[in-house]
Amino acid sequence: MLDFNKIEPEEGKLDLDLRCVNYDLDDKSHLRYGDWVTFKSHSSKKVRISRPESPRGENSDRQPQDADYPSLSYELESEILARFPRWEYWKLSLVNKRCSMLLKSGEIFEIRKENGFKEPSVYMLASGETNWWTFDREFKSRRKIPDLPSDVCFTFGDKESLCAGTHLLVSGREIDGLVIWRFELATNCWYKGPSMVNPRCLFASATCGTSVFVAGGVGIMANSEVYDTAEKYNPDSRSWDLLPRMKRKRKLCSGCYMDKKFYVIGGRNENGELTCGEFFDEGRNKWELIPDMLKDDPVLTCHSPPLIAVVNNELYSLEASSNQLKLYMKKTNTWKMLGQVPVRADSNRGWGIAFKSLGNELLVIGAASSSASYSGNSMAIYTCCPDPDVIELQWKPLDSGRNRLSSFILNCSVMVA
């Protein structure tokens, strides 16, 4: 009889020593070596439990050691480890060489993708820091990722960040020009490139699954014109592909992915501020203009790009001048006020604020409002499940200022893998 004393079902949790396995088995008591096990997942994989081979042909009843589980096939072991919380994956390199290679090759993330496992984490660069930090979803744990090996110009210059699958892309300027540095979660290392077809800054971006879209922006030359070009990044090939040109040239714009379309909103060009938006329909391979999408937004001098995020396929905006959260009404092309957020977006005209989607919640990070419990200059972190029908939204504070990082956020991206 197969011993499952160390394999107990527990939803959503798997300890590294394999004492907890997220099986969906109806009856473990009748399983024997040679039986097939079906995982109730998107891929409904079926694997065989094999009996370990005893040394010198002996029929040993010894228990497997801490990091040695010969009774599990490689396929079954991989399926189990894929259910392990992604935040703890760094421990795999301490188990054995095969587990380490499962992580570094990226195979474990492919298994997670096939089975529909998704877990968000937040990557952030705060003012006064030269290192990026990554946080788990609840901001209960954080880790400093390796130093980005660029030059001083890139380190202290303006940067833009975006996530595509398990890649964190950071765009900025080195002494020789615009570059992109790529952090790969699997290897925990930085790599240079690939550069965009049209290198740019001050652009809009949005993530869709494992791909990322960029549009608009401007080059770094003094006489560079504002772009109407767009591109799509494929993390599998580590390459950029050109998309059709937008209807309007724009820089300092914002992007999001909603209704299976890439939206680009606001910004400015040679003629001034833009209140229109537009979206790219990948199925039709064309852009459509949305006039007056931001017509009621007050125009501030030197303001940030629009602060927008999509949760449950609904578009939300944080108005920098009033700290008001707004919901976009698709049918009427108008915005509905939902109340104030607990951070000060108005203190720096929207700059230094992180406003992101985090699963089915909104995430906002910045300087706390006067009514908040945070003190000093440490960042305030809040999440909220937005509901257009409630009178007052309930914002949940996270971290309680323990991290002591600056409240001015230079870059922030959410990785879902």
For each feature predicted by the language model, list its residue ranges.
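Short active-site-adjacent structural elements
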Residues: 346, 364-365, 371-379, 390-393
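Skp1-binding F-box subdomain of Cullin-RING ligase substrate receptors
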Residues: 3, 30, 51, 58-142
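CRL adaptor-proximal regions
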Residues: 1-71
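WD40-like beta-propeller blades
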Residues: 335-342, 389-402
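Conserved short beta-strand element of beta-propeller blades
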Residues: 70-71, 110-127, 150-171, 180, ...
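Beta-propeller blade signature
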Residues: 134-137, 179-187, 227-237, 275-284, ...
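A structural motif specific to WD40 beta-propellers
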Residues: 143, 191-193, 241-243, 288-290, ...
